[in-house]
From Swiss-Prot:
Organism: Wolbachia pipientis subsp. Culex pipiens (strain wPip)
UniProt xrefs under SMART domains: DHDPS (SM01130)
CDD domains on file: DHDPS (cd00950)
Enzyme class: lyase
Annotated family: Belongs to the DapA family.
A cellular component annotation (GO) from this entry: cytosol
EC number: 4.3.3.7
Organism placement in taxonomy: Bacteria, Pseudomonadati, Pseudomonadota, Alphaproteobacteria, Rickettsiales
Subunit structure, as described in the record: Homotetramer; dimer of dimers.
Record's keyword terms, sorted: Amino-acid biosynthesis, Cytoplasm, Diaminopimelate biosynthesis, Lyase, Lysine biosynthesis, Schiff base
Protein name (database record): 4-hydroxy-tetrahydrodipicolinate synthase
Record function comment: Catalyzes the condensation of (S)-aspartate-beta-semialdehyde [(S)-ASA] and pyruvate to 4-hydroxy-tetrahydrodipicolinate (HTPA).
HAMAP family: DapA
GO terms of molecular function: 4-hydroxy-tetrahydrodipicolinate synthase activity
Length: 293
């Protein structure tokens, strides 16, 4: 797992009406990621996992595993109901995957011991390494540093995806659990977090620009800071509406997915403008041409 410094948090393409998954578009996106040697994260928030039925999630995982992609696969693990989550882990045990992304329990706002006991249950069930996910803006509570300390010796606890929005959180995690890798969970923060010891990036932007993001993160990890202002400006356009609305809109605009459809409660009508995304795409492709020249 340590050789993978870029993981793409993949979108789940739908048909026009949104009532089924567009597997042809999904295969196209995943093939691009594999060709660029990016790991893939399926069924996270970018993949609209909470909007999928259990049957759809199982079918999606089976479909992706049957593709036999030459890349590593992480599967999202929901943080809602313990027993349903354990059942999901039971299903995934039979799949040739490489890791889990385990979200901090949402809505309930558990404290240190609640989080510790929750993750202990999940880690005991896991058959592959797990990346815990700190996403306070969605979960309603942070993954506490003391929780990380309590779990740091578990053999299945491999890494953290930190989407706290501050470098200080990474520093706290590294202090209490120096053996645990911490990945940046915000595209625009990778220059700063790489400088503080991040192991890599779990990226939304790599859905659209897989090879460019791969090269950019590689440079950041080697100590360079290539055009951080332009990079951050472009990445922020992917969050002008709730993720993954802008990303799907741009993927559709450049012909990588057939439809920009998202499922309720998300709506494409909340996207302010496609023009901002087109300008960001132009900026990123310009950076690619500059670095290749």
């Amino acid at each position: 797992m340590k050789s993978t410094f870029l993981w793409t948090a993949c979108v789940t393409p739908f048909n026009c009406s949104g009532d089924s998954i567009d597997y042809q578009s999904l295969q196209r996106l995943l093939t691009m990621q594999a060709e660029t040697e990016n790991g893939v994260v399926l069924l996270g928030s970018t993949g609209e996992s909470l909007s999928l039925t259990d049957s759809e999630k199982r079918t999606l995982v089976e479909f992706v595993c049957e593709l036999k992609l030459n890349t590593k696969i992480i599967i999202g693990v929901p943080g809602v109901n313990l027993y349903q989550t354990l059942e999901w882990l039971d299903f995934c045990k039979g799949m040739p995957i490489h890791g889990y992304l385990m979200t901090t329990p949402i809505y309930a706002k558990p404290g240190i011991m609640g989080q510790t006991l929750w993750f202990e249950k999940l880690l005991e069930k896991a058959h592959v390494p797990a990346m815990l996910y700190n996403i306070p803006s969605r979960a309603g509570v942070s993954l506490h540093a003391e929780t990380v300390r309590n779990l740091s010796s578990h053999e299945k606890f491999w890494a953290i995806k930190d989407s706290s929005g501050t470098v200080d959180t990474l520093t706290q995690y590294k202090k209490v659990a120096p053996n645990i890798e911490v990945f940046c969970g915000d595209d625009n923060m990778i220059p700063d977090m790489a400088a503080k010891g991040a192991a890599g990036l779990v990226s939304v932007a790599a859905n659209v620009w897989p090879s460019v993001v791969h090269e950019y993160v590689k440079q950041c990890m080697s100590g360079e800071n290539p055009q951080a202002d332009s990079w951050q400006q472009a990445c922020k356009t992917l969050f002008t509406a709730s993720n993954p609305i802008p990303t799907k809109a741009l993927l559709h605009d450049i012909g990588l997915i057939e439809h920009k459809t998202v499922r309720l409660p998300l709506s494409t009508e909340d996207l302010p403008s496609i023009e901002t995304l087109r300008q960001a795409n132009k900026m990123i492709l310009g950076w690619k041409e500059l670095t290749n020249s």
